[in-house]
A protein has these predicted regions:
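N-terminal secretory signal peptides
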Residues: 1-11, 15-30
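C-terminal segment of N-terminal export signals and the immediately downstream linker at the start
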Residues: 30-43
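Extracytoplasmic "Venus flytrap"
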Residues: 40-61, 65-68, 74-85, 106, ...
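Structural motif
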Residues: 73-92, 204-213
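Periplasmic-binding protein-like
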Residues: 97-106, 124-128
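Flexible loop/hinge segments that line or gate small-molecule binding clefts
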Residues: 118-144
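Short beta-strand elements at the ligand-binding edges of bilobed clamshell
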Residues: 134-159, 169-174
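Extracellular/periplasmic Venus flytrap/periplasmic-binding protein
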Residues: 177-213
């Protein structure tokens, strides 16, 4: 079940959580109450769902979930990597009855996902980032795709397209996963021509369309 405009979501999830969300929390918090109806999955994005990139890829996955029987999906866009994500997670649990949360941005995990996982042991949290360790709560998992393999193929294509032998890569932040993607891209390009070079620019933000352009 997709929510309305982002502005309305911000009001309902963050501003009103301390008030109206208190009503009926005990019923929504019980595992039995969730099991009686459809499974509700909450998906949280750090930027807009139509960014033609990371967030949109997750949004397409959420759209596929909506087609599954017995599954409802609630979503919120433009949630910063601050305490805002904790408020959004809590409202999805307490207001929407979510039993599975998919916070998709790297900076959500520590401390925000870990805090909410400990506070809500019956709710499963699956974070995109590959940051899980055995010390984390049992209901807090982390996953990550083999994106570098796709970037390797992108590098091959770029190598065949370039005439200058100079490539560019616009990235967000120099975290290990991003650096792995950059390396995959350059290795793919150099499998075609070892003399190719790549200039990398970091924007410093996960979703900053103007600077990315």
């Amino acid at each position: 079940m997709e929510r309305g405009p982002v502005a309305h979501q911000s009001i309902s999830r963050r501003t009103l959580l301390g008030g109206t969300a208190v009503l009926g929390l005990s019923a929504l918090a019980s595992t039995g109450a969730r099991a009686a109806g459809p499974m509700t999955v909450g998906v949280i994005y750090v930027g807009p769902k139509d960014d033609y990139g990371y967030n949109q890829a997750h949004a397409k996955g959420a759209s596929a979930l909506k087609g599954l029987p017995g599954v409802e999906v609630v979503e919120e866009e433009n949630v910063r990597e601050t305490n805002d994500v904790q408020k959004t997670m809590e409202s999805m649990i307490n207001m929407d009855g979510a039993s599975l949360l998919l916070p998709t941005s790297f900076g959500y995990f520590d401390p925000h996902v870990l805090i909410e996982a400990r506070k809500n042991p019956t709710v499963q949290c699956r974070h995109c980032g590959g940051l899980w360790t055995e010390a984390n709560p049992k209901n807090a998992g982390s996953y990550f795709g083999y994106i570098a393999q796709g970037q390797y193929l992108n590098g091959i294509v770029a190598a065949h397209a370039t005439k200058s032998k100079k490539l560019g890569f616009v990235a967000a932040k120099p975290i290990p996963q991003v650096l792995n993607n950059i390396n995959g891209f350059l290795l793919g390009a150099r499998s075609v021509d070892p003399s190719i070079t790549c200039q990398v620019i970091f924007t410093g933000e996960w979703s900053l369309a103007v600077k990315e352009a």
